[in-house]
Amino acid sequence: MQANSNKPNDNFYNSVDMQELSGETPVGWSATCLDQTICYYLNCDQESSAESDNSDSN
């Protein structure tokens, strides 16, 4: 029996949707904070995914 992976497939994040999110113009402090938080977690997810891919290939 093969273990299920919780990692989303490569098409999980649509690049068009990502560009649409990055094109939004934040208004006010809380919107700017939210925008920075979203970017932070997207970057963390990408780094984690890359590290996972590297460890799988070793």
UniProtKB/Swiss-Prot annotation:
This protein's UniProt keywords: Chloroplast, Plastid
Compartments where found: Plastid, Chloroplast
Domain of life: Eukaryota
GO cellular component terms, A-Z: chloroplast
Name of this protein: Uncharacterized protein ORF58
Organism: Pyropia yezoensis
